[in-house]
Each structure stands twice: as structure tokens, then as C-alpha cells.
Amino acid sequence: MKSVRICVAAITAGVVCIAVMLGILSAAIYAENESGDSFIGLMYHQVLKDESRAGKYIITPGELESDLAYLSENGYVSVLPSQLVKIREQGGRLPEKTVVITFDDGYETGLYYVLPLLKEYGMKAVINVVGSYTDEYSRINEEGKHLSYAYLTWNEIKKLSDSGYVEIGNHTYNMHSNNVERNGCARKENESDEQYRTVLYEDVARLSDKLQRVTGKRPVAFAYPFGSLSEGSAEIIGSAGISVFMTCCEQPCSMNRNGRIVINRYNRESGRSAQQI
């Protein structure tokens, strides 16, 4: 298989990451969206009121509101991953101006800042959560948390899922780390095919099983941590019930009518509006 360059976003301290290009994937994985309806994917992370912290992966509620207002006023229709799957299964077509709005990592601000704005502007979004983060913050008393850094609890994820405006995506249970041994859910050096298949499948299935128990809905979407993956990753993740794959590559998307649905996403950093994207 031919190799292509893929976008990798490395996140430091949970919110700061650097987009880099890593040639580790076959052309087939990113060529799967070459025909059909076109759409745009937007990638957000944290939303904070403290303007001094705004940057590459943190925006303010005001910036998010400006984006949603622009999208709404200009006829964009937000579509969820499960809706993409349904449209494909039924042979339907996407709205002329389709956008998929995504939030990675599962910050608690998704409930308190993002959801109210989604409701106000009639938009929908997918929030991709990390299971181990949610476990940790579900054990902490409210007094021990602060909205500026806290992650969603399982109860809060249930509220978001029940809102009708948010779909919950899988961002791995415990592979959201970038260290010398493994970068996200990519294969470790000298890891056998069987070892890699087992560890990746069990991680993804663990979070999907938990989300199904909590929300009553099994996630169809998966976001690669840091955009990092290896040849064979998508097939393994797909065997855990995932059919929509989110990357960090900044390029338009097209609906794949036959294989996997891939959502390439433009990172929305502070100062770079949805209109500019």
C-alpha cells in the first residue's frame, strides 16, 4: 500500500497540542471518502471564559456562539455521526450545507457552556469522551472539581445524551496518551498483530459497552487520539461496532456510500472562526 501523510495533533496537559504530519497510514484509509455528498467537519476541544487561556485548542463561549450564529444564519445544517450512517443506509442525500460539529476529550464545559449554545442556535454536536477521564471525575466530589479543567462525569454524559442535541463518541477508554511506548491508539514498536488487535479492540469495546449501559445508545463514532493510528487500526476499531472515524486532517469530507465514513476535521483555534474555515 502507498503511504500518505496524515495529520497528527498531539495534546499536552489535556488541552495544548501541536498538529504534525505523520506518514504511517495507507492511502486507502484516507481515500475512503472520495465520492458522494460533501460536508465539513469542525473540531473543538475546550471552551473557557478566561480569555487569557484562549489559544490553539481553547476558545471562549463568545467565539463558539459566533461560530454557531454564523452557521445558523448561513443555512448550515449540523448532522450527527448516527445520522450520517442512517442517511447512507437509506440511500438519502446530505443537506446542501452540511457540517459535523465535534468536541474532543469530554470536558465538563460541554454541559455548561456548549449545550446551552447548541440549543439556542438549533445545532447538534458529537462530544468524544475518554473513559478513564470520566471514571476519575465521576469519583471526585463537586467541591474538588473546577470547570476550568474538569471532565464530564457519567451522569453528565447521560444528561448530554438525553438532551437531543449531543451524541457521545468514543475517544478510547485509556489510550489518550502520547509517550515513548505508544502514541494514542497507534501500534507500539515490536508489538505483534495479535497483541495490537487485542489491546485496541478491548479498549474501544470497553468504552462503547460502558456508554451503552449509561446512555442506552452504543456509539457509532470514534475519534483517534491525537489523530494517530496505524495500518489496521480502523479495521480493529470497526470490529467493535464503530462505523464513523474522525481524524485531525484539515480537508473537506465526502460521504462514503460503501465503506467506512471518515470525518476529516478543521481545528477551530481561538481567532480562527468557522467563517474563515
Kindly give the residue locations of the regions a language model identified.
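His/Asp/Glu-enriched short active-site or ligand-binding loop at hydrolase and phosphoryl-transfer sites
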Residues: 190, 197, 201, 213-220, ...
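Aromatic- and glycine-enriched glycan-recognition loops and surfaces
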Residues: 58-72, 106-108, 147-155
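Extracellular/periplasmic catalytic domains that process cell-envelope and extracellular macromolecules
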Residues: 33-36, 92-95, 119-121, 160-163, ...
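Metal-dependent polysaccharide deacetylase catalytic core of the NodB/CE4 family, i.e.
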Residues: 42, 46-49, 54, 97-99, ...
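Membrane-embedded segments
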Residues: 87, 96-98, 102, 106-114
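Solvent-exposed, polar/charged alpha-helical surfaces in well-ordered, non-transmembrane soluble domains
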Residues: 62-69, 73, 112, 116, ...
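N-terminal pre-catalytic segment of deacetylase/amide-hydrolase enzymes
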Residues: 14-99, 255, 265-272
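N-terminal Sec-pathway targeting helices
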Residues: 1-17
